[in-house]
C-alpha cells in the first residue's frame, strides 16, 4: 500500500511542479511600464516601474533610476508622471535607457517633502527587492518640482546614489508652489553651501534654461557655484535661450546618458 501511495505522489508531482515554475518565471519576466503601489502612514501612493524588455532574457543586475515628476503631473492615477520627462524619452528610444526606472506620483497639492518623499524612498526600496538591481548604480533625477525633490532626497541620503541630475530645479522655498518649504535646515546657514557640504563628492549634473520663466536660473547657478567651491563633482549646463522645459533636450542627450551610466557609488 505504501508503495502504491508513493508511486501516485511521484506521478502527480511532475505535473504540478512545472506549473509553479512557469508561474514564477512569468512573474519575473514581466516588462514594460508596470503599475505598482506603496502605502505610507496609511496613504496609498501609485508609481510606475519601467522594466526593459531585455530584462526578461538577462541574468544581470540592472541599474536603477528614480525619476521625480513636476507639479503638472501630480494626481492619483499613477500615469501622468509617465507622460512627461524621462518616460517620454524612453518611449522615443528605449535603447538609450537600459535601466529599471522608478516613477512615483505625488497627490495634487503635494510636493516631494515629508510623506511623498517617504513614498519615493519606499517605492525605490520595493523595486530593488522585486527586481534584480545593482546597488552600485542607483541614480536620481527630477524636473522642476521634481528637481527640488531630487535635491531633497540627495540631501537626506547622498550615500544611496551614484549620481544625481536636477533639471530646472530649486533649493530654496518656492512661494508660488503650495506646500513648498525649506529642504535644508534653517540653522545650517546658506542653503546652497549646506547642500554642497552634504553632497560631498556625489556626481551631480545640473541643467537649467537661461530664460526659464518659472524657476529662476539663479537657483541652479548658485547650486553649481557652491558645489564647485566645495570641490564637489559637478557639471552645469545652461541652455542659451532655453525656457522651463529643457528636460526633453537633457534626457535626449547621448552625452548625459553616457555620463549617468558611467557613475558608480563605489568610486566616490
Residue ranges and their predicted role:
Residues 64, 68-121:
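Active-site machinery of serine-nucleophile hydrolases
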Residues 54-60, 109-145, 158:
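Gly/Ser-rich "nucleophile elbow"/oxyanion-hole loop immediately N-terminal to the catalytic nucleophile
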Residues 48, 64-68, 100-105, 137-141, ...:
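Structural recognition of the beta-strand scaffold that forms the well-ordered cores
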Residues 55, 70-74, 107-111, 144-148, ...:
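Solvent-exposed loop/turn segments at secondary-structure junctions
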Residues 149-153:
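Hydrolases whose catalytic domains are alpha/beta-hydrolase-1, hotdog thioesterase
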Residues 17-64, 141-143, 185-187, 221-225, ...:
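A domain-start/cap signature at the N-terminus of enzymes
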Amino acid at each position: 500500500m505504501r508503495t502504491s501511495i508513493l508511486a501516485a505522489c511521484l506521478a502527480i508531482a511532475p505535473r504540478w511542479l512545472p506549473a509553479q515554475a512557469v508561474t514564477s518565471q512569468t512573474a519575473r519576466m514581466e516588462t514594460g511600464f508596470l503599475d505598482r503601489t506603496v502605502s505610507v502612514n496609511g496613504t496609498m501612493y501609485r508609481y510606475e516601474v519601467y522594466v526593459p524588455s531585455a530584462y526578461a532574457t538577462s541574468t544581470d543586475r540592472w541599474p536603477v533610476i528614480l525619476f521625480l515628476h513636476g507639479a503638472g503631473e501630480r494626481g492619483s492615477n499613477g500615469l501622468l508622471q509617465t507622460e512627461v520627462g524621462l518616460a517620454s524619452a524612453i518611449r522615443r528610444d528605449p535603447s538609450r535607457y537600459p535601466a529599471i526606472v522608478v516613477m512615483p506620483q505625488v497627490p495634487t497639492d503635494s510636493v516631494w517633502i515629508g510623506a511623498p518623499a517617504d513614498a519615493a524612498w519606499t517605492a525605490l526600496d520595493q523595486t530593488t527587492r522585486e527586481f534584480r538591481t545593482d546597488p552600485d548604480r542607483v541614480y536620481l533625477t527630477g524636473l522642476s518640482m521634481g528637481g527640488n525633490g531630487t535635491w531633497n532626497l540627495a540631501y537626506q541620503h547622498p550615500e544611496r546614489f551614484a549620481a544625481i541630475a536636477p533639471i530646472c530645479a530649486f533649493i530654496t522655498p518656492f512661494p508660488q508652489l503650495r506646500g513648498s518649504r525649506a529642504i535644508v535646515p534653517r540653522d545650517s546657514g546658506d542653503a546652497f553651501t549646506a547642500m554642497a557640504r552634504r553632497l560631498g563628492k556625489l556626481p551631480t549634473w545640473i541643467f537649467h534654461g537661461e530664460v526659464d520663466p518659472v524657476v529662476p536660473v539663479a537657483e541652479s547657478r548658485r547650486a553649481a557655484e557652491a558645489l564647485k567651491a566645495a570641490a564637489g563633482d559637478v557639471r552645469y549646463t545652461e541652455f542659451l535661450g532655453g525656457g522651463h522645459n529643457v528636460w526633453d533636450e537633457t534626457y535626449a542627450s547621448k552625452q548625459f546618458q553616457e555620463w549617468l551610466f558611467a557613475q558608480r557609488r563605489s568610486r566616490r
